[in-house]
């Protein structure tokens, strides 16, 4: 019964989330004359089986009316399955689901060697039929257009006639898809009459683009290439799924949803009170039953990160039956992937602008405890070295590569960008979720400037776009910075905290501010309304420690007129005010120490965590504690 209640609760929460509108990103400078090729995320293709598109069977590009029809046809069995599932029996419902999914995706099945069982075709592969202007004129839907929100904004600058939509047989490995991209770019050049293109890519498209640049970049067909949240080194979610070891992080999942819908209510702490572990059981029971249908897709194997690849092969593949698949994926993992830093650097040396935008600060939603954007680990997306999730490098940490004296350690000291594929051309955004680049004012504006102009050539080109940034998505509500300091840093001369309201619709009031490491007294007025997009300056008194290379956490508690009226956000700030802290080895916790931590004993802490109320109690206590100290009479 508890699991059934969880299902109902999660559905209600998801349905209650609302979308938020936002202003367009601002592109400054001369607009590029080259057409844009959009290389989308995973499975963004339409495949058919048969002699022609008109008479063939569509096997990807789902008809959701048909899906609903099948659900209704088996509604009784699904109802029984949910009933048994509520009592910890996932076999029945997953048998029902697998018996529908395997036939539905049968035509997509690959042999154990990675070749397609059926001869499938793409709808169109030429530039004319993939051109936005053509599609808008000849189709009433957006099925064949990729990343529609993004392309609509790009069209404001270059017109739909200069936007082209790439697609591939996404089941195949990155090397195969990169070959298709090369052929498509030749078609775009011929159709547009231009000698180069600009590339915008996302997720799997980022892996394909990086592979294309490694294998075909020598041709010089690209001017700007922007890879957002790219799966260059793989996707953590693929390993968790194929190995049936999903352990959903419910809080991260709900924050992902909040981020995507840009909701201004903070629902995720409710999920802490009622974990949704039933999803883990469902998926881990289902995946082995559908593995014969999707488990031999080369793209899924290229998604396995190199540190887990051999274990996955040994567990799931027969070395003889899957020899062909293994050969192709081995080549990606052990030849192409290691060459990408050198090949991308060569592209830059030859005049191309290559850039990566990646998210940090979240676990993988399916359970992998690594720093990520919720889907792809930061290390896989960028090549950076990351501390274990929930920890940071110890005080006095020294970056691995010197990078000509450039500082490559993140403000929270959990990311070392000196080992990145492109140390000077990669932007890291703490709190950015996968696929949400367009839904963050900072990343949206950055990606359009990188794509459509030649103004930004590296992370030092424009101080408005620092290499490390905290997300400004509306769901975060507030964003803090120290006046006169670089993003994420605090120096000795600082005397003012600037807090911005990142929400789009809600007025915010600052209820309290807590700092660990820094002993600061803020002149805070809790009755000042901060309008959406506006900021206030909060003076403070206190000394910044005369040290560098350590982190102070600043937690801003806020109040707003929403269903969840109180919330908070914690940001880590690197202190840069003197000699480096004495070097220590290993890692330390990244979690802030708050007043509540100092008064709650271990037994009470366990009880509150068990019932999911610790965060709520902590917020209320810390706000009261702040004002008790601020108003105390000596």
Tell me what each language-model feature is.
Residues 534-540:
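Short strand-edge motifs at loop-to-beta-strand transitions and within beta-strands
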Residues 24-200, 204-258, 363, 373-484, ...:
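N-terminal non-catalytic accessory region
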Residues 161-168, 172-175, 289-371, 396:
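Alpha/beta-hydrolase fold catalytic core
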Residues 4-22:
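Sec-dependent N-terminal signal peptides of Gram-positive bacterial secreted proteins and lipoproteins
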Residues 499-504:
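Asparagine-centered strand-capping/turn motif at beta-strand->loop junctions
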Residues 493-497:
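Structural beta-strand segments of beta-rich domains
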Residues 547-551:
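Extracellular Ig-like/FN3 beta-sandwich strand-entry sites
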Residues 250-320:
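Alpha/beta-hydrolase-fold enzymes
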């Amino acid at each position: 019964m508890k699991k059934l209640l969880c299902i109902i609760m999660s559905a209600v929460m998801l349905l209650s989330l609302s979308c938020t509108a936002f202003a367009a990103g601002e592109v400054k400078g001369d607009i590029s004359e080259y057409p844009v090729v959009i290389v989308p995320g995973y499975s963004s293709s339409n495949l058919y089986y048969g002699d022609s598109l008109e008479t063939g069977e569509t096997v990807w590009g789902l008809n959701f009316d048909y899906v609903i029809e099948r659900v209704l046809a088996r509604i009784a069995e699904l109802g029984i399955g949910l009933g048994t599932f509520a009592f910890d029996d996932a076999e029945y419902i997953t048998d029902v689901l697998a018996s529908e999914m395997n036939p539905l995706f049968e035509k997509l099945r690959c042999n154990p060697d990675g070749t397609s069982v059926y001869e499938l075709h793409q709808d169109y592969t030429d530039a004319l039929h993939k051109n936005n202007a053509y599609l808008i004129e000849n189709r009433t839907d957006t099925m064949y257009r990729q990343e529609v929100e993004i392309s609509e904004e790009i069209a404001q600058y270059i017109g739909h006639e200069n936007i082209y939509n790439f697609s591939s047989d996404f089941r195949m490995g990155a090397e195969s898809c990169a070959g298709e991209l090369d052929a498509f770019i030749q078609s775009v050049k011929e159709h547009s009459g231009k000698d180069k293109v600009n590339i915008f890519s996302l997720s799997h498209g980022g892996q394909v683009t990086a592979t294309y640049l490694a294998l075909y970049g020598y041709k010089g067909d690209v001017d700007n290439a922007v890879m957002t949240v790219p799966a260059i080194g793989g996707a953590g979610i693929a390993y968790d799924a194929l190995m049936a070891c999903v352990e959903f992080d419910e809080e991260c999942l709900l924050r992902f949803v909040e981020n995507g819908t840009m909701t201004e209510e903070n629902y995720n702490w409710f999920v802490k009170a009622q974990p949704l572990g039933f999803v883990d059981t469902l998926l881990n029971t289902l995946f082995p039953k559908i593995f014969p249908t999707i488990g031999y897709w080369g793209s899924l194997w290229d998604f396995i990160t190199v540190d887990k690849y051999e274990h996955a092969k040994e567990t799931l593949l027969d070395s003889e039956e899957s020899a062909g698949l293994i050969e192709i994926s081995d080549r990606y993992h052990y030849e192409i992937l290691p060459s990408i830093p050198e090949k991308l650097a060569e592209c830059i040396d030859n005049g191309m602008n290559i850039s990566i935008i990646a998210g940090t600060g979240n676990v993988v939603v399916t359970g992998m405890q690594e720093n990520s954007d919720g889907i792809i680990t930061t290390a896989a997306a960028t090549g950076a070295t990351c501390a274990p999730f929930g920890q940071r490098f110890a005080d006095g940490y020294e970056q691995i590569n010197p990078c000509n004296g450039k500082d490559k350690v993140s403000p929270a000291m959990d990311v070392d960008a000196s080992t990145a594929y492109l140390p000077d051309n990669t932007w890291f955004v703490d709190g950015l979720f996968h696929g949400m680049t367009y839904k963050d004012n900072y990343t949206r504006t950055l990606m359009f400037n990188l794509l459509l102009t030649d103004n930004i050539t590296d992370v030092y080109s424009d101080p408005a776009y620092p290499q490390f940034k905290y997300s400004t998505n509306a769901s975060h509500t507030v964003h803090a910075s120290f006046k006169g300091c670089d993003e994420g840093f605090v120096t000795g001369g600082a005397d003012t905290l600037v807090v911005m309201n990142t929400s789009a619709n809600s007025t915010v009031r600052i209820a309290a501010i807590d700092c660990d490491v820094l002993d600061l007294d803020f002149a805070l007025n809790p009755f000042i309304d901060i309008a959406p997009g506006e900021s206030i300056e909060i003076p403070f008194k206190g000394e910044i420690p005369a040290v560098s290379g350590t982190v102070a956490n600043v937690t801003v508690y806020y109040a707003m007129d929403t269903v969840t009226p109180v919330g908070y956000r914690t940001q880590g700030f690197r202190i840069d005010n003197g000699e480096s802290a004495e070097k220590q080895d290993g890692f330390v916790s990244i979690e802030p120490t708050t007043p509540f931590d100092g008064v709650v004993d271990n037994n009470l802490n366990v009880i509150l965590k068990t019932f999911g109320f610790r965060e709520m109690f902590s917020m209320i206590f810390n706000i009261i504690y702040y004002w008790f100290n601020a108003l105390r009479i000596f």
